[in-house]
Amino acid sequence: MEAGNYLATHLHEVPLIAVFCYNPGIMTITDSDLDRPSVVGGGSVYPAVQNFLLACRNEGLGCVLTTLLCYEEPEIKKILCLPDDWYTCAHVPVGYPVKGGHGSISRNGLEKMVAYNSWID
């Protein structure tokens, strides 16, 4: 959370923010009839965002997927001249890593992240 809060308060210092947008009117939302929030609508944009993140890292750039600007969407839409039927769904601040490079990637082990045949607490 500390890193996210830092980013939120320093977002104006980032040299580039890539803004990914979608139009729900031209997307196929296949789970809208379920009794829960849609997770399919707009989800197809995230593979493109992931490719963008990987390409940035390959070029030595630092970046992170955020949705911080969704809270300011009316202002962002005005700044970017987005049509009324288009919305932002991902915001990727891009710049050179502060410490001059990427550190090692650390993740939880697969056994903590994947369940097979049943839910694991």
Label each PLM-derived region with a short phrase:
Residues 1-45:
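Glycine/small-residue-rich phosphate/adenosyl-binding loop
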Residues 2-6, 76-79, 101:
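Glycine-rich, charged/polar anion/phosphate-binding loops
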Residues 29-33, 75, 103:
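A short secondary-structure junction signal
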Residues 40, 61-74:
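GST superfamily/GST-like fold recognition
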Residues 51-52:
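Aromatic/hydrophobic pocket-lining residues that form π-stacking "cages" and hydrophobic walls in ligand
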Residues 57-58:
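Short hydrophobic alpha-helices that are characteristic scaffold elements of the AMP-binding
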Residues 73-88:
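Short, electropositive alpha-helical surface patch
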Residues 89-121:
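C-terminal helix-cap and adjacent tail motif
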